[in-house]
Swiss-Prot record:
Entry keyword annotation includes Transport: yes
Lineage: Eukaryota, Viridiplantae, Streptophyta, Embryophyta, Tracheophyta
Membrane-crossing segments per the record: 231-251
Ranges for domain Longin: 12-114
Protein name: Phytolongin Phyl2.1
Gene (UniProt): PHYL2.1
GO biological process: protein transport
PANTHER family assigned to the protein according to its UniProt record, in alphabetical order: PHYTOLONGIN PHYL1.2, PHYTOLONGIN PHYL2.1
Length: 260
């Protein structure tokens, strides 16, 4: 796969079935109509949908009043698609906080936010190829980010502090090293978390087993004490009966009362 091959075919922000702003690849004529049909046929009671067919992934996230939809190449990692939706969501929230688009969002029309979100789509779609320079931002192009990482060795968290900056472009190879590093860190964290869970499970299993043994021992001891108390009561009753029988024999001088 070449570094300038496009992996993002389409992306949009919608309210209901109204497309507020969108990005569509010029190499995919008619993809806007396909995307609109997908949004119109979203099944009810779903907040997240992802479907891969013909080497393309159709993903949609519904967050409150807005829907975020994208058509991606199937090789795009899940973490990258999540970043895409988070970037679109943060851009929409910024516009809502600004208040300048309140009327447009109350009664939305097609592409009413297109001009305001074009820079965001340009940032997301930047791939660093010469034929796509018109889509690149000065601070959002993969080349500038690669240079910045090489010179300053900045972490991903510090990059998040720059509002509007590209954290992890979906396309191209300039951030391949960063993506591999992040994947290794994620795998290491997952392995550590899994080991921790196994340790917790082992300790918890031992605790449950010890608890069952202790409970069984307690029941056995309680049963033994109950039996002992029953025998004591029976023996006490027997002693009383024998004493009363002896008194009766003494008064009657044997069995003369019965004979009389």
């Amino acid at each position: 796969m070449t570094s300038n091959q496009r992996m993002l075919f389409y992306s949009c922000i919608a309210k209901g079935t109204v497309i507020l702003a969108e990005f569509a690849s010029k190499e995919e004529p008619g993809i806007e109509d396909l995307a609109l049909r997908c949004i119109e046929n979203v099944p009810p009671h779903h907040s997240m949908i992802s479907h891969t067919v013909h080497k393309r992934t159709y993903a949609l996230i519904i967050d409150g009043l807005f829907s975020y939809f994208a058509i991606l190449d199937e090789v795009v990692a899940k973490s990258e698609s999540v970043w895409l939706f988070n970037r679109l969501k943060s851009a929409t929230e910024s516009l809502m906080e600004d208040g300048s688009t309140a009327d447009s969002l109350d009664n939305p029309t097609q592409h009413c936010l297109q001009s305001k979100l074009d820079p965001v789509f340009a940032e997301i779609a930047a791939i660093g190829g010469n034929h796509n320079k018109d889509l690149e931002l000065e601070f959002g192009s993969p080349r500038s980010i690669a240079r910045e990482i090489k010179s300053n060795n900045q972490s991903l968290d510090s990059s998040k502090g720059r509002k509007g900056g590209a954290l992890m472009p979906l396309l191209g190879k300039p951030l391949r090293v960063l993506k591999n590093k992040k994947r290794l860190q994620t795998e290491a964290k997952s392995e550590g978390h899994w080991n921790e869970k196994k340790m917790d499970l082992g300790g918890g299993g031992k605790g449950v087993r010890n608890g069952l043994i202790h409970d069984h021992h307690h029941r056995q001891k309680a049963k033994q004490i109950w039996r002992k108390h029953v025998w004591i009561v029976l023996m006490f009753d027997l002693c009383i009966c024998l004493v009363l029988f002896g008194i009766w024999l003494w008064i009657c001088q044997g069995f003369q009362c019965i004979d009389g």
